[in-house]
């Protein structure tokens, strides 16, 4: 599809992507402390030197130097171009890739920023936590949580809080100018009355449940009312960072407790998740006011081989289970397992696990959980009685098209055989039925009863098949890094050839050029030296003022330095690899990686002085360039057209020229 991919979409996509999930779906990772390790997929090795950091969301190989974020990994591992890699990750996240036409934008690199909603939501969570500890009206919330048997430790682990009664507690605490209020609306923290324009807190007099994404960032809230207000449970609305059909409450907390989960239990509510955790069962998650979707299933199967659905035994619970089964079937590969556990009428996981304890609840799972195939045929036989010919015909009509959705060949074949045994139809007849849609089933159920609320990677603002930036020649006066050996003998990600500016940069052909003769030199340009210094000493960025005024559009190296400064000023904790990963697959990224790998020759005591000498020179060069451009413009005019200021500029120029010795 033609058109540009907006940078905001790339940022959102990376924010919703867990690099551990992406990498582990392609190579086998082993937990090593906080990180994961493996033998590098990009070069041959016997001892693992490839590391994936879930906290920093990047990978790095200490053997060959390969590194980047999730998008870069997909590009290099799957040998995809940038747009195709974006499509791959977007498909995984259940997102459609938008495209926009280029609209007269310049080529100046601009840094993406994390959504401002994340710190705002985090601040709101802290406000709710403090209110649970100290607000005068907290007693009802504390009593509710104690009544559910929760300890302070569990409340801390899940970040539980309290939204006090009143219309503007959070508004007064976090509110500010119109931009801040707009951000609070965008984050779903405030509601605006469409008639009066009045804004007020969305959550009032509720126990608060922060909802986290796979990286632990707070993206939304759920609130359980303490009084008689409706609805009983209220979720945040859809926002730029929260998409309820994809997120699962408690998934982050479950993985924090055990990164090597082999099964995840899906329950219906926040309190079910928390009550199970209180009793030592730390693998439960819950959907957020929606039925279990295919996106939920895909996400869970990327993490674990087995899913257990645990629902109430009432009609609503059984309807929810069937809808979950319908979402499971198209994703049920051989080797994956799904089970269903129904609790006694009037019980839910919260009440039952508190009544009988962890051991008895686990025994219940072992003894009573039904395999998917057993549950599937049991439910259909309740609707179509196989004791009659008419019932067998109806059963086959219902079951055959559903079985056809199963991608796992072995399981699909075995379930067809079971259907043949029940109905007496041949496999050929069942295959013919599979291509006919079943009649509407009484198992097609309505929506969930939970009421919802109201409604780094890049050097430019947009992405296309090629980077959108000014020509980027290899720097004069620096030794290029030796290329690492590629894992693919036919395609090298970087062979050292610089772009000569004579033709369009071909990102798709990166690595297909012949390397030029290298001429070692001893002097590195001051701008490149500053870039390298900043990569190794990012704290220096915080001492630079007005970084955006340091570089003219024609100076691509200075522009890159400015981009690094701005990125570090927005997030000072970024590592060298995270910075390099922002430009993965572009000439800037390869230059930064080469600079980062070069031998360090600057005396430590001179680092800061040399760095700020370069910053000063760039600033002076910028001012001089602006003056020269203005002077050229003035000299195009006749003297009578000049303003007094322009005449003064001209006199100053000729005065300086007259007093300066001539140069040959």
Curated annotation (Swiss-Prot):
Q: Where is the composition biased (Basic and acidic residues)?
A: 94-104, 487-515
Pfam families associated with the record = DnaB_bind, DnaG_DnaB_bind, DNAG_N, Toprim_2, Zn_ribbon_DnaG
Q: State the residue spans of region: Disordered.
A: 94-115, 483-521
Residue ranges annotated as zinc fingers (CHC2-type) are: 40-64
List the InterPro entries hit by this protein, alphabetically. DNA_helicase_N/primase_C (IPR016136), DNA_primase_core_N_sf (IPR037068), DNA_primase_DnaB-bd (IPR019475), DNA_primase_DnaG (IPR006295), DNA_primase_DnaG_DnaB-bd_dom (IPR013173), DNA_primase_Znf_CHC2 (IPR036977), DnaG_bac (IPR030846), DNAG_N (IPR013264)
* Residues in Toprim domain copies: 262-344
Note on cofactor: Binds 1 zinc ion per monomer.
| Residues that, per the record, bind Mg(2+) 1 | 268, 312
Q: Which residues bind Mg(2+) 2?
A: 312, 314
Record keyword Iron-sulfur present: no
**What does the record give as EC number?**
2.7.7.101
- What function does this protein fulfil? RNA polymerase that catalyzes the synthesis of short RNA molecules used as primers for DNA polymerase during DNA replication.
Which PANTHER family does its entry note? DNA PRIMASE
Protein's UniProt name: DNA primase
Species assigned in the record: Pseudomonas aeruginosa (strain ATCC 15692 / DSM 22644 / CIP 104116 / JCM 14847 / LMG 12228 / 1C / PRS 101 / PAO1)
Chain's gene name: dnaG
